[in-house]
From Swiss-Prot:
<dbReference type="GO" id="GO:0005829">
    <property type="term" value="C:cytosol"/>
</dbReference>
<dbReference type="Pfam" id="PF03966">
    <property type="entry name" value="Trm112p"/>
</dbReference>
<comment type="similarity">
    <text>Belongs to the UPF0434 family.</text>
</comment>
<dbReference type="InterPro" id="IPR005651">
    <property type="entry name" value="Trm112-like"/>
</dbReference>
<protein>
    <recommendedName>
        <fullName>UPF0434 protein CPS_2127</fullName>
    </recommendedName>
</protein>
Length: 65
């Protein structure tokens, strides 16, 4: 089973409540505003601030697919 991209319509960043982008290659949900990447483990997004990975400015401006 793969991550259901339909969930993107209802998921939001737990920090700023903003839009998340799906990075299929990295299996992460990206919040460009907070520069945080949330992992997807076993097709389940881990939307916990303390589990998020900080990303640099260059990564946060890239469009993920």
């Amino acid at each position: 089973m793969a991550f259901d991209t339909k969930l993107m319509e209802i998921l939001a960043c737990p920090v700023c409540k903003g839009k998340l982008d799906y990075d299929k290659a990295a299996q992460e949900l990206i919040c460009h505003f907070d520069r945080l990447a949330y992992s997807i483990e076993k097709d389940i997004p881990v939307l916990l601030e303390n589990e998020a990975r900080e990303i640099n400015a260059n990564q946060s401006t890239e469009q993920d697919g």
